[in-house]
Amino acid sequence: MIVVEQDLWIQAPMTEEVTANIMQDIAPHTKSLGNQPLTFIDLFAGIGGFHFAMRSNGVKCMFASEWDKFARQTYEANFRTIEPELFAKGRFAGDINAVNLDDIPPFDILCAGFPCQPFSNAGLKKGFEDTRGTLFFRIAQIIKDKCDKGYPPKVIFLENVKGLAHHDKGHTLDVICSVLDELGYRVAYRVLNAKNFGVPQNRERIFIVSWRKENPASTFHFPIGISADKKPIFNDEELKDLVLKTRVGDILLHNVEGKYTLSERLYQGHLRRKEMHKQKGNGFGFSLFNADSPYTSTISARYYKDGSEILIEQTGKRPRKLHPIEAARLQGFPIGKHFHIVVSDTQAYKQFGNSVAVPMVQTIASQIIEQLLMNTAHE
């Protein structure tokens, strides 16, 4: 995990000095299939969690799409210098539904952390048309378009909330798997937890990895964590014994401005609500953590409202919210040298709450790429 002092944080776009060595640092060797660079597209890109994870594995971004204007600001501030072609060629799009499919170049891996939406239950066909009107339908359209043109993506790499597995009584996930199967892909999925990938956050997400059926070695084995020496872990016994241990203190700043400390009024409100929930017999209410806590609860996009899901203990003071830098670290962003916050605290909390945990995606991506390269070597 990358930890820097607070004074290394820059709330502004990257300078030439900062970006001079970025290519070497985060993408030392561009991976290739044959004589062509390995490529991906970044849909529902947010602030670039997938982009950092893929680029650190030596994969080149060919196209990205994000509609939120503040997320676009953060994405552009962090990638314009290191991926100039993406912006110079107009390949950083807004609303993906407004994009002409011909404007999306061929690519090897499709990455998308897409919103969870219900599909039509009409007829329960679980086919391509059942997804019409949803954002997943657009993903399916892009895949189908490239397949029809003779450029089938090699891998589809998707992320969603854990609840997708049971959303609409399992119908939503069934439809996604059925559509990918219809498009020529063998599907694997698994719920993974960021706390097992070196991030001190209890954050469960479902990942879907799909390979072309004609690939003879298309079964994908998910890493379920990383060990202390940063090697992927694939079974539960190793996860229990070898997983990289984390603590919340790893991501905390030494000095945080007073404005992040809860006001007396807000803190008393939290205490009242927690007591009320306790009397009702449930565990709702604010969650308090300290430097020795192994991990926090899940940071969400609503964290900016009152911070109640993750509060940090302070000696002799009321608890405080996370600083935006800490929120970035909690998601594994390389804050400081390689990542910069260019929006308000409110927007930053939303952005990090909506993002993927970078080390988790990084580890899965590494396994995907290793298998792709191995398969290519045996062709």
Enumerate the language-model features and the residues they cover.
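C-terminal target-recognition/interaction regions appended to catalytic cores
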Residues: 3, 262-379
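Core alpha/beta nucleotide-donor-binding catalytic domains of modification enzymes
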Residues: 7-9, 15-153, 162-167, 171-174, ...
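Short Gly/aromatic-enriched secondary-structure transition segments
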Residues: 78, 224, 313-317
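Class I S-adenosyl-L-methionine
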Residues: 99-107, 119-298, 302
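Short aromatic/basic micro-patch
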Residues: 113, 155, 321-324
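Proline-centered helix-kink/hinge sites
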Residues: 114-115, 153, 200, 334, ...
